[in-house]
Amino acid sequence: MAIIKPFKGIRPPQDLVEQVASRPYDVLNSEEARVEAEGNEKSLYHIIKPEIDFPIGTDEHDERVYAKAAENFQLFQDKGWLVQDDKENYYIYAQTMNGKTQYGLVVGAYVPDYMNGVIKKHKLTRRDKEEDRMKHVRVNNANIEPVFFAYPDNDKLDAIIKKYTAEKPVYDFIAPGDGFGHTFWIVDREEDIALITEEFAKMPALYIADGHHRSAAAALVGAEKAKQNPNHRGDEEYNYFMAVCFPANQLTIIDYNRVVKDLNGLTPGQFLDALGKNFIVEEKGTDIYKPSGLHNFSLYLDSKWYSLTAKAGTYNDNDPIGVLDVTISSNLILDEILGIKDLRSDKRIDFVGGIRGLGELKKRVDSGEMKVALALYPVSMKQLMDIADTGNIMPPKTTWFEPKLRSGLVIHKLD
């Protein structure tokens, strides 16, 4: 069972939300944040990317930078740019992209559920990234940014969400840059709060979609605080961390593609011949070719597109990891032919989120920066959940979720 609770969110006043809200900390670098926050003292970047308040080149992991985050968080509250709600609520956060809307419930997720596997992971985390986020949670004593969860589809929750979203929202705006819509409601009726809590309690699992490092950091700080408190009861606010939970059937994972600098000493002809061992290779011409389904790949090389279809026997349908197209392409193309053993560390490979389109792959190859591009059919939510349920970990750079959660719509304090 998944334990959740409502919380007293800290939020911007309605007329300030567009100035406060920002992209998540990990989708842009310090210089990009500096540009986006220019002339806007109310931008959340002053809290989640506080190095922008220091001279260019300041180490973002400097202790003074973390301290600045806490100072700015307090300043935002003192100035009334962030205000805490009087009572504990759940919240509904809707995101609209390309005419499609997904509706998430903003809740306090339970730290022990993360520790005991009710909250399921599909990705490995790096200790240095965990420690960075842990410091941020500690100094602010808050989850400034939410994590992104999926839950099994639930008709009763759908009905509650439908009821509230028929009413006037608290926030409703289009984000600059990407043009995605962000809409927000407060779930404040006690009977609805109770029903949401009950429905989550019936769920065997919740799934981290995006935000593995934030989840790990929030849970580790919560456990740390429990250990440090001699009067720990288990119901304190630090036992919970902020998550936006979406029904799995509303979520779309988009493709996460690869570009490689060279052919590992092979000529284009030799490379295509080598591919023929494990794939049916078909030339598709100069028009962009998109993978048509699982086990079909799109290759761009020397101004031409190719279809690659994995031959029978090159993958195992009964292996939840082995059947993934990222595994097939990593093993049979990147490793076996191109000599790329470690996707995380090899400098010859880069990754391009599908949000940029296959035209971005063509552009990077045509520019001469890269030699070859490989586009993959996206992973399904069912595959992600099956892998998490079996305790497996997806290969690196497998999932790309879009739209990203906007930060700054609501914050969860740990006391």
Predicted regions and their residues:
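Surface-exposed, charge/polar-rich loops and edge strands
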Residues: 1-415
